[in-house]
Amino acid sequence: ATDYEDEEFPGAVPPSVGAR
């Protein structure tokens, strides 16, 4: 995954979003 959106994080919150 790159940043936000569920790319390889289906139903989960990626650290990119959580950190932003």
From Swiss-Prot:
Residues recorded as bearing Sulfotyrosine in the entry: Y4
Glycosylation sites: T2
Subcellular location: Secreted
Keyword entries, A-Z: Adaptive immunity, Blood coagulation, Coiled coil, Disulfide bond, Glycoprotein, Hemostasis, Immunity, Innate immunity, Secreted, Sulfation
Modification after translation (UniProt): Conversion of fibrinogen to fibrin is triggered by thrombin, which cleaves fibrinopeptides A and B from alpha and beta chains, and thus exposes the N-terminal polymerization sites responsible for the formation of the soft clot.
Taxonomy, superkingdom: Eukaryota
Encoding gene per record: FGB
Name the UniProt record assigns to this protein: Fibrinogen beta chain
A GO term from the CC aspect: extracellular region
Description of how the protein assembles with itself and partners: Heterohexamer; disulfide linked. Contains 2 sets of 3 non-identical chains (alpha, beta and gamma). The 2 heterotrimers are in head to head conformation with the N-termini in a small central domain.
UniProt remark on domains: A long coiled coil structure formed by 3 polypeptide chains connects the central nodule to the C-terminal domains (distal nodules). The long C-terminal ends of the alpha chains fold back, contributing a fourth strand to the coiled coil structure.
Purpose: Cleaved by the protease thrombin to yield monomers which, together with fibrinogen alpha (FGA) and fibrinogen gamma (FGG), polymerize to form an insoluble fibrin matrix. Fibrin has a major function in hemostasis as one of the primary components of blood clots. In addition, functions during the early stages of wound repair to stabilize the lesion and guide cell migration during re-epithelialization. Was originally thought to be essential for platelet aggregation, based on in vitro studies using anticoagulated blood.
GO biological process, one term: blood coagulation
UniProt region (Disordered), positions on chain: 1-20
